[in-house]
Amino acid sequence: MADGVPAREPRFTAPMDGRSTFGRVRRIHFVGIGGAGMGGIAEVLHNLGFTITGSDVRSGAVVERLVGLGVTVQIGHDPVHVQGMDAVVVSTAVTEDNPEVQAARQQRIPVVPRAEMLAELMRFRHGVAVAGTHGKTTTTSLLASCLAEGELDPTFVIGGRLISAGAHARLGAGPYLVAEADESDASFLHLKPMMAAVTNVDADHLGTYGGDFEALRRTFIEFLHHLPFYGLAVLCIDDPEVRRLRGEIGRPVLTYGFSEDADVRVSGMEADGHRTRFRIEEGDGAAFAVELSLPGRHNVLNAAAAIALARELGVDVAAIQRALSSFQGIGRRFQVYPDIPLAEGAAALVDDYAHHPRELEATLQAARAAWPERRLVVVFQPHRYSRTRELFDDFARVLSGTDALVLTEVYAAGEARLPGADGRALASAVRDRGGAQPIFAESLDEVPGLLAGLLRDDDVVLTLGAGSIGGLPAQLGGGLTAGGGA
């Protein structure tokens, strides 16, 4: 102390871990904390010792978990919630006119996008990011499970609930942070991982890219160039767009897939009910068998990405085999529920987040592989009018191949209705193709009653979509009676 002036606490300290990571920031508020990506980051920061609060328009499983951990969550948005905060984190679903965002800006509290906060967490660990239009959540979950089985104790932030952990996120003591890299709003450009996988590149979220697929593709290239020159890009060579990327990436590349020229090659795939067996052949001649507790070719590719990443991080083959064989799954990713009791017999029930034609097709193929002799009854809730319009013909083509179909109105996700892109129009297009004859449901409330008159013993029900349909399986678990619904 000189002249009576006390020394200040250092803004940054070394080593930069725990609460020292963010300097003097101690109190962080999350606007829209109930989202899977938001809640996971909030949980990790809470476990690091930060004071976390949040708000959302409604409660839910993520909010309930956080409250159980001691996080204060308010239902509804109010400027008072950000008073005294050092930072405010927002998801892309939160608009600038949100009263908490406006109050934070007026008080000069930093307003931080969710992906930027994830990037800050990643900066002080070895970040491993999984990108791609489809398969991010499953691949990230499989990788986290492999690292955990290999005793690397990873931190992970996942868009789905890892059933074995009962959470979307976990703070580990190990050096690796595994997370999804979200291209839907181009926010993955905030991330600068050490390693990154790209599972596929498909036409989705084109509104973010001005309707230009090439702009989406260029953004993936930009993301991969956020890797350091000594990093690694792990690419699915089976995907034609990812194959195109390979020659434009100025970083070390490792490829995987069923293709003959893959560095990590999948062969000998065999379906066995809900499980799948296959072999992995590596470029140095090493080969080993894998049994995966998930069905479907798409999940084998997801597992191959996780294997390629885990092997590069030093996880031994035995640990990988144990992790994939015992993997308990992720919420809403081919999640198998108890059978639905019927008046006579029962029907199997599977729930999945699939909301893009390519995802629907992969999920249906997996179900047919698991239950080749059984009738598939699909309940599909389209997600967003814009996506339904952009991919209308593909949706109609895939859905017309179902055995029986209940199609609901589009889950708007805040969008205005678009003429010719609603649920009725899609049902009509499916009907015109001459395959499945869809039953249209104006709302999800009608679905249990419709299923009561449709289902028969030994059917397999698939509830599919990214919106509110995720709550339907719980309604069906009590059984169905003709005319009475669930």
Curated annotation (Swiss-Prot):
This is UDP-N-acetylmuramate--L-alanine ligase. It is found in: Cytoplasm. Belongs to the MurCDEF family. It comes from Halorhodospira halophila (strain DSM 244 / SL1) (Ectothiorhodospira halophila (strain DSM 244 / SL1)). NCBIfam families: murC. Pfam families: Mur_ligase, Mur_ligase_C, Mur_ligase_M. Pathway: Cell wall biogenesis; peptidoglycan biosynthesis. It catalyses: UDP-N-acetyl-alpha-D-muramate + L-alanine + ATP = UDP-N-acetyl-alpha-D-muramoyl-L-alanine + ADP + phosphate + H(+). The gene is murC. Its main location: cytoplasm. HAMAP family: MurC (MF_00046). One of its GO terms (cellular component) is cytoplasm. It comes from the Bacteria. Cell wall formation. Its EC number is 6.3.2.8. Keywords: ATP-binding, Cell cycle, Cell division, Cell shape, Cell wall biogenesis/degradation, Cytoplasm, Ligase, Nucleotide-binding, Peptidoglycan synthesis. SUPFAM superfamilies: MurCD N-terminal domain, MurD-like peptide ligases, catalytic domain, MurD-like peptide ligases, peptide-binding domain. One of its GO terms (biological process) is peptidoglycan biosynthetic process. The lineage of its organism: Bacteria, Pseudomonadati, Pseudomonadota, Gammaproteobacteria, Chromatiales. One of its GO terms (molecular function) is UDP-N-acetylmuramate-L-alanine ligase activity. ATP binds at residues 132-138.
